[in-house]
């Protein structure tokens, strides 16, 4: 199997755009620093081409054995493609056991086929930072040292004392008082200089719109159930008293059911519909056809039966 079997052809369209964008993020300065760092630890030369020098995985596996001895027990020196891919897979597994984050890893094809050299560079920089965190001393200052946990153990007395402390972000309550505050229930004057309203002279009064609950009572309030007169100054209507109730509002004082009849007929009297003369079915005729409002009417027998229910 030839070494060109895994090589891809040129990219076009969106694939070419994505590849060019990844290549634009590749930093040659970081590559030079990684080259110096790897060659200084392993003692092996990478060569002029960074990708081709690390493609077989032998230098990377040697690097992991320097950082963590025995992490890659077998290194394949063969030029076969699957042997080189096996070396890269063993190197990636060794980085995981070394404590690398999964998001910082690269795939074997990213280096073997030069698919994403930017991710390879990011992974090697993260590996250098992890080695610096674990105390590795090298002649090249490369990588970012990871922060360490700062754990503190406090006893119960210290924890309880901390509950009485207010942090600086919360402000302070030292010498806190209510001096200068408006008294409860007093006036809070609203004024506007544009409307020529004078500023408040004191804080001891409260406006009518704000109300007050000081010495609150119902003096001057309209009695429940009394008349509330609605008037309009534009129409010339005058204000009335607050002691009467209109007919539309009803009347509930001394209400009872006296004078009401339940179950009986309610005769409606109208002179227009009560003609003088004889009426069929035994109804009274003449001037007495329609009884006066004060007289008791005579009802047909079926009215009497209806009243008996």
Swiss-Prot record:
Chain's role: Thin filament-associated protein that is implicated in the regulation and modulation of smooth muscle contraction. It is capable of binding to actin, calmodulin and tropomyosin. The interaction of calponin with actin inhibits the actomyosin Mg-ATPase activity.
Residue positions, PTM Phosphoserine = 138
Picking any one GO biological process from the record gives: positive regulation of gene expression
This protein's GO cellular component annotations are: actin cytoskeleton; cell-cell junction; cytoskeleton; extracellular region; focal adhesion; membrane; specific granule lumen; stress fiber
**So what family is this one in?**
Belongs to the calponin family.
Q: Which CDD domains match?
A: CH_CNN2
- What is the protein's given name? Calponin-2
**Domain Calponin-homology (CH) intervals:** 28-132
Q: What is the tissue localization of expression for this protein?
A: Heart and smooth muscle.
User: What are the N6-acetyllysine sites (modified residues) in this protein?
Assistant: 8, 25
Where N-acetylserine occurs, the residues are 2
Which Gene3D superfamilies does the record associate with it? Calponin-like domain
What gene is this protein a product of? Answer: CNN2
- Which InterPro entries does the record cross-reference, listed alphabetically? Calponin-like (IPR050606), Calponin/LIMCH1 (IPR001997), Calponin_repeat (IPR000557), CH_dom (IPR001715), CH_dom_sf (IPR036872), SM22_calponin (IPR003096)
Annotated stretches, region: Disordered: 283-309
| Superkingdom of this protein's organism | Eukaryota
Per the UniProt record, the lineage of the source organism begins with:
Eukaryota, Metazoa, Chordata, Craniata, Vertebrata
SUPFAM superfamilies membership: Calponin-homology domain, CH-domain
Q: Name one GO molecular function term.
A: actin binding
Q: Which UniProt keywords apply?
A: Acetylation, Actin-binding, Calmodulin-binding, Phosphoprotein, Repeat
- Stretches forming Calponin-like repeats: 166-191, 206-231, 245-269
